[in-house]
């Protein structure tokens, strides 16, 4: 499985998480880019390269943050890149074996942290345990005003990262405890299900 992610923090999170729920000898490689635009700019050439050598058993997963983009339009662009490269996407495949799946973290990777607050609490024991029950945090994919900023504020309020959130360090720490089966983020669940389907 080849997983393309937009930034090193996503790579760090997934390196901690994926080995705990990928079974049966399946392997994966993670390829981080320098932001969403960098990945989107390089994606057509990367997918064209894959289309020339991809073995039947390989699967590609492309993961992007939605940020403040129109998620439907972003997904359309990602799907068009797959079609233009001659790769069969999960969306287009229906019941056929697919080669590539496009997934979007809504709105940002940090929403997935809010979806698994137990993992955050294990990595950062001083954070309040009731955060998921607070108004504005109940749906991890609908946190207003910037997910990473909200996450940073909570950590800073209890003495972590006073100089600013170190995203890769936090991703690594939380990924080590993340439970793929209990995350409340719908966008995480869509990603997890695609991974499980890819390794069947």
Give the residues covered by each predicted segment.
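N-terminal beta1-alpha1 ligand-phosphate binding loop
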Residues: 1-14
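C-terminal accessory helical subdomains adjacent to catalytic cores in phosphodiester-
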Residues: 11-37, 41-61, 66-200
């Amino acid at each position: 499985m080849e997983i393309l992610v937009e930034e090193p923090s996503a790579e760090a999170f997934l390196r901690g998480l994926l080995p705990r729920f990928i079974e049966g000898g399946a392997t994966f490689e993670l390829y981080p880019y320098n932001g969403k635009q960098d990945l989107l700019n390089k994606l057509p050439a990367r997918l064209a390269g894959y289309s020339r050598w991809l073995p039947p058993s390989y699967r590609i997963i492309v993961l992007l943050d939605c940020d403040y983009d129109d998620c439907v339009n972003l997904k359309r662009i990602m799907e068009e890149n797959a079609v233009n490269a001659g790769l069969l996407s999960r969306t287009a495949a229906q019941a056929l074996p697919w080669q590539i799946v496009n997934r979007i973290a809504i709105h940002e990777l940090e929403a997935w942290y809010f979806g698994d607050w137990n993992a955050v609490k294990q990595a950062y024991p001083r954070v309040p345990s009731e955060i998921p029950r607070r108004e504005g945090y109940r749906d991890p994919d609908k946190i207003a005003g910037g997910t990473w900023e909200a996450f940073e504020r909570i950590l800073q309020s209890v003495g972590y990262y006073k100089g600013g959130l170190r995203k890769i360090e936090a991703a690594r720490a939380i990924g080590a405890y993340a439970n793929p089966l209990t995350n409340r983020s719908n966008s995480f669940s869509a990603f997890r299900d695609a991974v499980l389907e890819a390794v069947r």
